[in-house]
Amino acid sequence: MTERRKELDIEPALVPQVWEDAVAACLAKDRSRRPQSAAEVAQRLQLAPGQTRTRMAPGKSSNRKALLVGGIATLSVIALAGLYFGGLKRQAKPVSQAAAIPEKSIAILPFENRSEDKANAYFADGIQDEILTRLSKIADLKVISRTSMQHYKSAPENLPEIARQLGVAHILEGSVQKSGDAVRVNVQLIKAANDSHLWGDTFDRKLIDIFSVESEVAKAIADQLRAKLTGQEEQVIAAKPTDNPEAYDAYLRGLAYMVKPASTRGTTIGAQKYLREAVRLDPKFALGWALLSYVDALSYLEHPGQPTAAIREEARQAGETAVTLQPNLGEALIAKGYYYYACLKDYGTAVHYFDQARQFLPNSSRIPESLAYVARRKGQWDRSDSFFNEAARLDPRNVNLLTQHALLYIELRRFPEALRKLDQVLDIAPDDLDTLALKAAIAQAEGDLPRSAAILAPLRPVAEQSNALETQIYQAILERRPAQIIGRLKEILATPDPTLGYINGELRFWLGWAQEVTGDHAGAQESWRQARRELESFLNEQPDNFILIGDLALTNIGLGNKSAALALLERAAHAITIEKDAIDGPIPIEFLARGAAGMGDRERAIVALQKLISMPYDGALGAGVPLTPALLRLDPMFDPLRNDPRFERLAASQARVNAK
């Protein structure tokens, strides 16, 4: 309504907030929320009988006057609504959602680090997160998830606009100053509509007493917002997760790695290091065990993680320990569910734990987000879409959530919808490299190489950003001009990062492919031999890593070792199936199509492509875009099939996705 008022040049003083609220109520979609009489409209406009009786004589004239006031109020609201919608019709601009914002809603901005030691920024982040976590466990509040806050400053000037973007009525700002074991926390609660200060306080405590600050702040905010707390919620707000300040400090350091906007292999390793230290210092620290389990399961699942049996076992043990220590800890239940989802692909058990967690974490976006992932793996595309939308209502500016929603559309080859989601990401993080690379990968899949080249040209991804780097290499290969990228790849691989594991070998496979496209057969053979050595060294500890197995199969085809390649392709097909995973299950089929084409087995390659071209899935190479007719036309790996009429028909077709 505020935005519409500005568009129509209505002075704020002439449209009090109470009138805007009354208009919103009259126009509510839910009939039960609308005023049911003129008197109720008058009451909403603060013209209730309690206000008007002192000015009225008793008797019938009082009733008539009340009706008159109510009638005038109603007509005024109708007139204002007419002005509102008249302007909307004339200008056809989006309407602010401020009218729908619940009063008991809050977002907590990043806390400012005022410590002299700037390395203490992790502590300020942690205090913000812990206060938010406590509030999010109150069912009567709407609390925006932390991940939507990451791209805001600690004390921005445009609080009303930020609140509108997040769909909340209140904002909490704060600062933290840490010196040794002394901590000062300053907070202030602001009503966003008029940028007014509702409550604030300063807390000076020792590190060992920091939990009391988090509890007091959460309780004060709940009181200010008039939230109704159950007995269980009061206990949760007052809970002390550990009695060991060193363990809590290590936990906050690990948490800081997890809240970084860009997640990389390095951030995962950093988080694991500090979380292991936290639970070593306090083996009864359930929250620490829960986060360690979640990080491990995430690392096991996501490319370029290292899905080793050791990481999977640590995720299991950490999750079990967390649930045993605190059976009603929502974070522990989520971690247990994520272990079953990511490590075992036991979706039924995963959903059971996620559903259990809901009653303890009513504001957690991670629960519907996790349910979206489960539905996607089961091929329940519409259900996944719905869960992503539910998560977005709790976490509207979560870059990872928006990206994952875009990936759902990419897997379905619904590229326009994917691009809209990616543009939302870029509105929040304009220079996000992975998002730009994904947009370029979509352009490649649509056959628009000039568009993808323009997006990729300014980017300088490093080895750790392997998806973006491989998208650049693929661009050069599709253009059949990879000479420049070969030089960059050699430079990157001259000092390989050991934390990347098998990804170094994967990049050497790409180097060999690029060299082969330029006609440097000898150089390609040398790169592939080195790639094979590096990839094979990880196979024993990652026996079910179908991406690693597929990379190794294609490398062996490049080296002319068909028997080894066929054995690996069969192994990849057994490591993951469509029945177990609708997204990743088709990846071995793409490896087979590429491998069969390279070996000259047209029949097997074309049969595989006929399956893939209408199947939703996550692509085998680069950014994970599925094969499209345009990519069949452009990709040199399919050159051996070009004279076959069946392949030509596939390459000339329009992609029609069978999402059943």
What are these regions (language model features)?
Residues T628-K660:
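Terminal, low-structured helical/coil segments at or just beyond the last alpha-helical repeat
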Residues Y338-A342, Y373, L407, G550, ...:
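Alpha-helical adaptor scaffolds
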